């Protein structure tokens, strides 16, 4: 029975992971590097203990750290020299201690959908309940409502069905280019990257009245599961939905996952465009940019 969730003992999996995330930019000639913003430090929590974290840049430059409005660690790099190659190297070691099969202690008032957030919850969730992409014809909302089973729908089952629906609707394709498709573009094209999966899920959930946020970070895939999961050797994106009692529940629509036993969050955001790992500029000729390479390695 749902209200007995708190009495169920969950099996926790403790694992130590090492992350290396290296981004290399190459230019055809030396350019003046502008300020760069980096979101590369994993978010510490009850389930994630950060042992060490280091970010280095070549050419060397001062790095200052701060926290943004969502509590994400934000590094700003002020380059003072010209260069034809820029290397940003982030390394971290951490312990992840999360239930492989989590049980959520959802408040009695929220077990059945639709439910109402408290006045304080609604105020604090604020913009996280507002869709960020236009849906002028109501196509996305109609798509999302198709997962509602009636006037009395189990809330967690609805969210699981919605996540599965994203995975069934979109074909997964890796995409190195920047940017994210709108939910309508994803529905029209029928394919997308993990970012597109997460955005479609979050926007659909917001349309149904949920508070939702995007999460970016890394995905750990054990060797025996690499053929069954998508998103290895790259940054990853997923979602969190706020449900009273349970708090923020993690959903990975790319892999039809619930819970964060193999997810390492770096940033949470209202809009996926607020959680770009590396953002910056340079001054030089328009054709000076040559290439970008990203290498991500998550090992136990």
List each language-model region with its residue ranges:
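Intrinsically disordered, low-complexity N-terminal segments that are enriched in acidic
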Residues: 10-115
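Structural beta-strand/beta-sheet cores of well-ordered domains, especially the beta-sheet scaffolds
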Residues: 15, 21, 34-36, 53, ...
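Glycine-rich, small/acidic residue-mixed loop/short-helix segments
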Residues: 38-48, 55-56, 255-289, 296-300
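Glycine-centered loop/turn motifs
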Residues: 91, 151-152, 228
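Secondary-structure boundary elements
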Residues: 109-192, 200, 208, 270-272, ...
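Hydrophobic/aromatic-rich core segments of domains that either
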Residues: 164, 196-284
């Amino acid at each position: 029975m749902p209200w007995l969730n708190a009495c169920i003992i969950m099996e926790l999996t403790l694992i130590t992971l090492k992350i290396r995330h290296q981004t290399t930019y190459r230019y055809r000639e030396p350019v003046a590097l502008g300020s760069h913003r980096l979101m590369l430090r994993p978010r510490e929590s009850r389930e994630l203990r950060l042992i060490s974290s280091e970010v280095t840049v070549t050419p060397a430059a001062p790095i200052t750290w701060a926290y943004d409005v969502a509590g994400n660690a934000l590094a700003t790099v002020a380059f003072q020299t010209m260069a034809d190659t820029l290397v940003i190297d982030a390394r971290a070691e951490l312990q992840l201690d999360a239930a492989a099969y989590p049980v959520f202690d959802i408040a009695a008032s929220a077990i059945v959908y639709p439910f109402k957030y408290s006045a304080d919850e609604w105020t604090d969730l604020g913009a996280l309940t507002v869709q960020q992409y236009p849906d002028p014809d109501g196509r996305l909302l109609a798509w999302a409502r198709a997962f509602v089973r009636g006037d009395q729908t189990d809330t967690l089952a609805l969210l699981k069905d919605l996540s599965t629906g994203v995975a069934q609707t979109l074909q997964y394709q890796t995409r190195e280019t920047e940017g994210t498709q709108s939910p309508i573009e994803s529905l029209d094209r029928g394919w997308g990257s993990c970012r597109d999966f997460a955005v479609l899920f979050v926007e659909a959930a917001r349309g149904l009245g949920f508070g939702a946020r995007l999460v970016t970070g890394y995905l750990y895939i054990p060797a025996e599961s690499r053929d069954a999961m998508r998103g290895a050797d790259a940054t990853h994106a997923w979602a969190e939905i706020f449900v009273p009692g349970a708090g923020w529940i993690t959903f990975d629509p790319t892999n039809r996952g619930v819970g964060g036993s193999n997810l390492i969050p770096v940033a949470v955001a209202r809009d996926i465009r607020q959680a770009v790992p590396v953002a910056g500029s340079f001054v030089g000729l328009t054709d000076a940019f040559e290439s970008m390479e990203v290498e991500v390695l998550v090992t136990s």
